[in-house]
Structures are given as structure tokens and as C-alpha cells.
Amino acid sequence: MALNIENIIAEIKEASILELNDLVKAIEEEFGVTAAAPVAVAAAGGAEEATKDSFDVELTSAGDKKVGVIKAVREITGLGLKEAKGLVDGAPANIKEGVAAAEAEEIKAKLEEAGATITLK
């Protein structure tokens, strides 16, 4: 038995809304499917961070070892001593913006090792 697509489409065009509704229900029951559109699920806050492409590395606090943190900031940013000190003294401040996740984690580890408190945003 070969299907004639044109005949099926012509029959559907001539059917009323009620007949089409019954057809959809019959197809759903026969094949165990649903005609409902998939609903987009909102991501949780944690899941959103996991899919984030770039991060801002924020120095929240310099901690007790301010000199070590200033050295680390200079190394990471390439700033001069005065600029790096100003950045550390002005905490909270962004050290780097729009960096990849892996680089952000490296920067965070380096600054935390120096004694700073870091937040990735």
C-alpha cells in the first residue's frame, strides 16, 4: 500500500478544526507521542555560571600580605608599581575583565596564593 502524499494533504486541507483536533489526538494515542511544543527550562544560577564564556576577576580583599598581592597583580596585568598598588588599595576592584574560564581560574589561584580574596563574576 503506497501513500499518496498529495491526497493526504488535500484531505487535511478540507477537514474542519474539530476533525483535525480528533486526528491529532488519534495520532498521539496510536504512536505514543505528543503534539505539545517543548518548553524551555530556565537554568539555575549555578548552571548559568558553568556555561558562561568569560569572567571578570575581582579582587575583593588584599588580605594580610598586601606586598605579595601587589606583585601578583603587577605580574598578571603588566601594570606599574603605582597602578598595581592603587588597584589593590582600592579593593574591591576588577583585576581583569572578559577572560576565559581557564585563565580566570589560573589568575584566581595565583592571587589567592599571594593572600588575596578573589571573586569570579
From Swiss-Prot:
Transmembrane segments: none annotated. It holds the Pfam family Ribosomal_L12_N. SUPFAM superfamilies: ClpS-like, Ribosomal protein L7/12, oligomerisation (N-terminal) domain. Keywords: Ribonucleoprotein, Ribosomal protein. The keyword Hydrolase does not apply. The keyword Ribosomal protein applies. One of its GO terms (molecular function) is mRNA binding. InterPro entries: Ribosomal_bL12, Ribosomal_bL12_C, Ribosomal_bL12_C/ClpS-like, Ribosomal_bL12_oligo, Ribosomal_bL12_oligo_N_sf. One of its GO terms (cellular component) is cytosolic large ribosomal subunit. GO terms for biological process: translation. Belongs to the bacterial ribosomal protein bL12 family. Homodimer. Part of the ribosomal stalk of the 50S ribosomal subunit. Forms a multimeric L10(L12)X complex, where L10 forms an elongated spine to which 2 to 4 L12 dimers bind in a sequential fashion. Binds GTP-bound translation factors. PANTHER family: 39S RIBOSOMAL PROTEIN L12, LARGE RIBOSOMAL SUBUNIT PROTEIN BL12M. Forms part of the ribosomal stalk which helps the ribosome interact with GTP-bound translation factors. Is thus essential for accurate translation. This is Large ribosomal subunit protein bL12. The lineage of its organism: Bacteria, Bacillati, Bacillota, Bacilli, Lactobacillales.
